[in-house]
């Protein structure tokens, strides 16, 4: 098992949490992005740069992640595809997507996209706060206790 990170949009504070977890637990963390991502020197952390382009990083993650792996992403369509493939998906706010919740998220995403295309200003998600960071760290720890065996 390893952790994959959709790193193009992943907040730095979440990456820092993942770096600490990788070294503490000994799990491989791979950040995938279409630009260079600086990572600390560690045998448990690596960065993969893919070509720039729409969904290139997402496609790489889908191709490389194996059932049982965990992907950190806020990309709902990516999370849906991963869950279908038996891969776990956790967003940077600490929500572990499931087969049940991902469908609801997709419907809401599509609804908001329809609203935006009709001219309604919907705004984006609020900034990540301390509670979100703590929730992410807690959910990640809980997930790893249940699923990661050295």
Curated annotation (Swiss-Prot):
Pfam families reported for this sequence: DUF188
- Coiled-coil annotated spans: none
TM annotation in the entry:
none
Matching CDD domains, A to Z?
A: PIN_YqxD-like
Which HAMAP family does the entry link to? UPF0178 (MF_00489)
What NCBIfam families would the database entry show? PRK00124.1 (NF001095)
What family does the entry list? Belongs to the UPF0178 family.
The protein's name? UPF0178 protein PBPRA1738
Q: Which organism is it from?
A: Photobacterium profundum (strain SS9)
What does the organism's lineage look like at the top? Bacteria, Pseudomonadati, Pseudomonadota, Gammaproteobacteria, Vibrionales
């Amino acid at each position: 098992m390893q952790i994959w990170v959709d790193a193009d949009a992943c907040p730095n504070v979440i990456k820092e949490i993942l770096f600490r977890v990788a070294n503490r637990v000994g799990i491989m963390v791979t950040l995938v992005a279409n630009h260079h991502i600086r990572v600390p020197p560690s045998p448990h952390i690596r960065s993969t740069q893919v070509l720039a382009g729409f969904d290139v990083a997402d496609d790489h993650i889908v191709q490389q992640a194996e059932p049982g792996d965990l992907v950190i992403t806020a990309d709902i369509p990516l999370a849906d595809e991963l869950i279908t493939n038996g891969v776990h998906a956790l967003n940077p706010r600490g929500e572990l997507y499931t087969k049940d919740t991902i469908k609801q998220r997709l419907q809401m995403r599509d609804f908001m996209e329809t609203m935006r295309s009709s001219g309604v200003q919907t705004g984006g998600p609020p900034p990540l706060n301390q509670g979100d960071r703590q929730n992410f760290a807690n959910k990640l720890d809980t997930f790893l206790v249940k699923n990661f065996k050295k």
